[in-house]
Amino acid sequence: NWCGYTSMYIDITPYATYGDDVNTIAVRVDADAQEGWWYEGAGIYRHTWLVKRSPLHIITDGVFAHPVKKTESQWEIPVEVSLYNSGKLTADGEVEVTLLAPDGQPIATKNQKLSVKALREGIANLPITVTKPLFWSPENPVLYKVKTQVKQNGTVTDEVETKCGFRTIRFDNNTGFWLNGENIKIKGVCSHQDHAGVGVAVPDALWEFRLRKLKEMGVNAYRVAHNPVAKEFMAACDSMGIMVLDENRLFNTSPEYVRQLEWQVRRDRNCPSVILWSVFNEEPMQGTENGVEMVRRMYDVVKKMDPTRPITAAMNGGFFSEYNVSQAVDVGGFNYQIESYDCFHEENPDLPLTSTEDGSALMTRGEYVTDYSKNLMDSYDTQCTGWGATHRRAWKAVAERPWMAGCFYWTAFDYHGEPTPHRWPTVSSFFGIMDLCGFPKMAYYLHQAQWVKDKDVLELVPHWNWPADSIGKPIKVMALSNADKVKLLLNGKVISEQAVDPYEMNTWSVPYKPGKLEAIGYKNGKIVSRTKVETTKDPVQVHLTPDRNSLAGDGRDAMPITVEVVDSKGRHVPTANNMMEFTLTGPAEIIGVGNGNPNCHEPEKGNKRSLFYGLAQVIIQSKEGSGPITLTASTPGLKPATITINAEQVPPIPSIAAENPPMLLNRWVASPLSTEKPDATRQIADNDMNSWQPVSGGNLIKLENANFVILRATFNPYQAHQEEGGSILFKQLTGKAEIWLNGQLIGSKTTDKEEDFTVEFPAAKERCDLRVLLNGTTGEAVGLKGNVTVRTKRMIP
């Protein structure tokens, strides 16, 4: 597999050995070559499954069950099931699909018999008709299930449940985007896949945490940039109601990359959240005939597998070239280029358009002064890249154009790498609406005020903890609200009242005076919202806030816990930077720490992290089992905080534990038989293939007119063996035996019976010469009936 973002499936049946033989799965990861220009991470960072299947089975992602509207009241799910027969003979079976309502009740069932030849695929088509289903939407993400079973002789041999949703989508050249017949604006974000403390190895629960923060901000769509994401992320978008622009990693039409594209479409085409495919991001060939031809071919690959969704390409140039890829897609995709929106629309009035990436505004959470010498960006939405726009300008450009379907802001969260516009020692980006931990920046409340309609929003920035020499000096104050107007007060005195500008929001210049800065929001002349920032006292106590009250004790569930300090009145101190130390007891472990500071070089693994503008995060993950989990956070001079979270007993997730790979010794040679006891330490030439004969485990040696035989094998010790020795396990060793290693007797078996036998050996720095001197009665069989493995004393990291 030549992509770090796509899955691969390998049938290991031809390579597996059975019984006591050792099967070792080794995966070599080579991350020398970059796929992206951000910090991508490396290794096996998503789930890996060992799957046992019947010979006739449903292939992975082999059920296509995406509903299609037929009439105003009638829908069809053209269920297509792909089977594979790994057996040696033709297999006959029956495929049964059942549509389950959101409450689990069966709605309809279809059956089809089919016969699949050995090592071939078979396809069953079982269309299901549905009348007046409930619709999937961001506000009400209703999911149905298609249960698919394979039966042979009345017995279920394979079963898969596939979630799906009923919804219609349409991109219109004049009116933008329509979902279920309703004209809505896409309010989207882009993001990479890493989080503070864990990098790209993000636990499933953290995906839910991140998406929940976005939903609260008013987001209804997410562009997976610029690669396929984890399957669990897509499932969370389905269940939480977040539409997805599903983008591939590499723009290439060679067979390997077409295979990757096919895998992505096959995996995600059942997701109701997916509203649009994107076949590339900002490719240099976007304004060339070659680029058009490549997109045409990728377009065809996608449409063959999913004819129901439109396709775009995220262009950042080439829009006005004679040949450009907008000519080969269903929806034109703009990355930035705000100034070209109107001209392009005039020249291409029949092409639906969306912004596929915009913004690239820059902020440091908690900072309110830009200082390039310190790699700091202010939080007033004044800074952006040369190619981008501020949050306010970018949204206004989309919101005021009805033919523009929507936007996808760069980015939802900060991410490791790409510290534009700075360089080292900055180690993460400034683009995020939230920081690496998911702590909101000012932009979060700005978009919440612009996008949330079902609740009142009012936030004030900045904090009100300024040094004494700031008294009397003007402080820029912003109110972020969806009210009609906002009144600002300082220490009870009205400063002014302003009508809310839904794009620019409201700004004041307020001479600093310690105390309480308060904002009041009005709609239709009535107070609908209040908020305040206060000058706090010095911190006196640490405070911990868990994201949830419990963890599933499955060894996978995880949660972020917010760390802060409060003053004597329990108020958050927004300027604190105390170093925190964490201790944890119970069935859990700390898997990461962070604070959202793009210039911080503290380790993201361990039990310490400083606050950054009053906040830090510690991420814990459950172990298997149940019981109380207790976390304590402390810092010198302040009262520590302790919380207890319960790990709940849940059914264990089927898994195979990672073990030390035992070294299998399977290249043995046997000496000539003898009636007298031979010298087990005598020199033997490695190339002596005349007097010594190859033997294998499982085959005993009959002592014809003899009583002794020597078995010999050599091996190069692992590093752990070199440092502290190990053990050798003989499975079903038959006959009396002396075990010699490098000329030293390390163990003796004194019985003739067949049994497992283990010997320990000391640290061995060089190549090891292992000999087994076997002794038995003439005419009996002795030897290695099972395998022989060399094991370490500890886990190899």
State what each model feature region is.
Residues 16-18, 22, 26-91, 163-168, ...:
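Non-catalytic, glycine-rich low-complexity segments
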Residues 8-14, 34, 47, 53-57, ...:
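Extended substrate-binding grooves/exosites of carbohydrate-active enzymes
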Residues 82-172, 505-515, 523, 533, ...:
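Extended acidic/polar, glycine-enriched regions
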Residues 91-96, 138-145, 474, 482-484, ...:
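Short flexible loop/turn segments that cap and initiate beta-strands
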Residues 22-30, 50, 102, 395, ...:
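Accessory carbohydrate-binding/adhesion or oligomerization-edge regions at the termini
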Residues 78-83, 149, 475-481, 520, ...:
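Beta-strand-rich structural segments
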Residues 1-61, 86-87, 102, 228-231, ...:
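Accessory beta-strand-rich segments of carbohydrate-active enzymes
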Residues 14, 126-135, 507-512, 604-624, ...:
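Short, hydrophobic beta-strand segments
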